[in-house]
């Protein structure tokens, strides 16, 4: 039986990546610091996924165990040394933290003369996740280790898409996910091209798919969340029923669609519109009760220069295309208040202590004076 090491035993790890690996016949070693989940995985060796869709179908996942990387890093190194595949779903900020452990695992492979090609795939909500992880891993390898990794280890970037809502269960391993899923891997960066997973798409150029997902799902979801919060809603399901929120999301996606069509000639306009309409339908799924606080969390990161709003705004402006709905949404983001979100608290503190223009420059990284003025006007237009 093939073995996978998967970093991140959270809802996405178990409810999406784990499901896919299990369906492809892998034994899965989940790596996490959450003792409750790791212990439950080891005690039971299985868990159940519920699809948030009519019929609420159950999917059984077995041949799983858990490794606590804080308490037993040696076991993780040993698992990587003999793994057929390594994946992550832990969040972009945690990738550099697991890099030393992956580096040790690769060194252990080298020491064991394991020359089987290995791919390390970061399944994160970011552009270039695997290559970013590679950079961090290589910081912990000596020249011989880098040579080994260059020869036998691939870090193919991936785009992943599945809504896994905030949820609470008595069973720590139970997880509910939407029935839609998409996992796309950049085949050109793979080392083990013989290992292809069913239900995963392999493409020669990932960029169009990553941008399509980022500027449709991520931009659309965040637009729904920040507009909904501004209008007083607490869940995505309730917010999107309001025509103001729905039209804001639809308008934002129309703007990002014009950008995608101008940037990538392989997209068909009707197909892209259908894809984005499906995205909006997913947000309306009555089986998913997603809190706005989850979707809108980390507003400072989401206002970043290369993130889901500022980047399309910049690129639309460069092309002379409309970005008014995106800009309007950015104005609402600066008014996002959520006491349990450290970044939201920090953003409001910055706005209280510094001139608005300085905060805009710091948070968005914008240098374009015209765009900075537009953001300022948008924020002020949302004052109450």
Curated annotation (Swiss-Prot):
CC terms in the record's Gene Ontology section: cytosol
Tell me the GO BP annotations in alphabetical order.
mannitol catabolic process
Q: Which Pfam families match?
A: Mannitol_dh, Mannitol_dh_C
Q: Which GO terms describe its molecular function?
A: mannitol-1-phosphate 5-dehydrogenase activity
UniProt KW Transmembrane keyword: no
Give the reaction(s) catalysed: D-mannitol 1-phosphate + NAD(+) = beta-D-fructose 6-phosphate + NADH + H(+)
Q: What name does the UniProt record give this protein?
A: Mannitol-1-phosphate 5-dehydrogenase
The organism is Lacticaseibacillus paracasei (strain ATCC 334 / BCRC 17002 / CCUG 31169 / CIP 107868 / KCTC 3260 / NRRL B-441) (Lactobacillus paracasei)
Q: Which gene encodes it?
A: mtlD
